[in-house]
C-alpha cells in the first residue's frame, strides 16, 4: 500500500514538472541548489588556473617589465631652461669686452727711444691733443730736468739742464723716413707715426722740417 502511494506521488510530481530534489525536505531554501551550483561554476571559470597565476607573478617580478611599463606610462618631462645670473654675467662680460676692444682700437702706442738711454718707453698718441702735450709727457717719462725750448721756426727741442745736451724729437713715418716732430698737422702725425726718437742735435742736422 505504501509502495503504491510513493509511486503515485512520484508520477504526480513528474507530471507537474518538479524533480524530487525540489520537493525533498532539506535545510536550504528552495531553488538555492541551482544558484549555488551556477555561482560555483562561474567562480571556477573566472578564477585563473595555477599556471596562469605563476606566469603573472613571474611577469610582475621581472624588473625589465616594470621599467618598461614605467617608461611607457610616465615619459620624462623636459628640463626647463634656467634663466638668471649666468646670462646676466655673460652679457656684462661681453659688454666689457666690447668696451675694452673699442678703447684699445682707439689707442695708438708707439715706442720712444732717447739717444744714450738704455731703455725704451711707450706713449699713447691718442691720449694727447697736440705736440705740446706730447713733449710734456716725454719730459715727465724720461728726465725731469729736461726743459722744452721752442725755436722761431716752430722747431722744438728738449734740453738737458745738467749736461746741456739738446735733443730733437723725431719720428719714423710709414715710409721708414725719419722726420722732425711738428712738421705736419697733429692728426696726420698720429696716423703716420710708427715710433719716436729723441735724437741729439748733432745727429739731427740733416733733418729739416717740411713745410706745412
Curated annotation (Swiss-Prot):
Q: Residue numbers of motif EAR-like (transcriptional repression)? A: 25-29
Example of a GO biological process term: regulation of DNA-templated transcription
What PROSITE patterns has UniProt attached to this entry? PB1 (PS51745)
Which tissues show it?
Answer: Highly expressed in flowers. Expressed at low levels in roots and seedlings.
| Compartments it resides in | Nucleus
**Which stretches does UniProt call biased (Low complexity)?**
32-49
Q: Which SUPFAM superfamilies match?
A: CAD & PB1 domains
Superkingdom per UniProt: Eukaryota
Q: Name one GO cellular component term.
A: nucleus
State the UniProt keywords alphabetically.
Auxin signaling pathway, Nucleus, Repressor, Transcription, Transcription regulation
Q: Where is this region: Disordered?
A: 1-84
Domain PB1 residues, every copy: 107-201
What induces or represses expression of this protein, per its UniProt record? By auxin.
Q: Which InterPro entries does the UniProt entry name for this protein?
A: AUX/IAA_dom, AUX_IAA, PB1-like
Q: How does it assemble?
A: Homodimers and heterodimers.
Family that this chain belongs to: Belongs to the Aux/IAA family.
Q: What does this protein do?
A: Aux/IAA proteins are short-lived transcriptional factors that function as repressors of early auxin response genes at low auxin concentrations.
User: What is this protein called in UniProt?
Assistant: Auxin-responsive protein IAA15
- Taxonomic source organism: Oryza sativa subsp. japonica (Rice)
Gene for this chain: IAA15
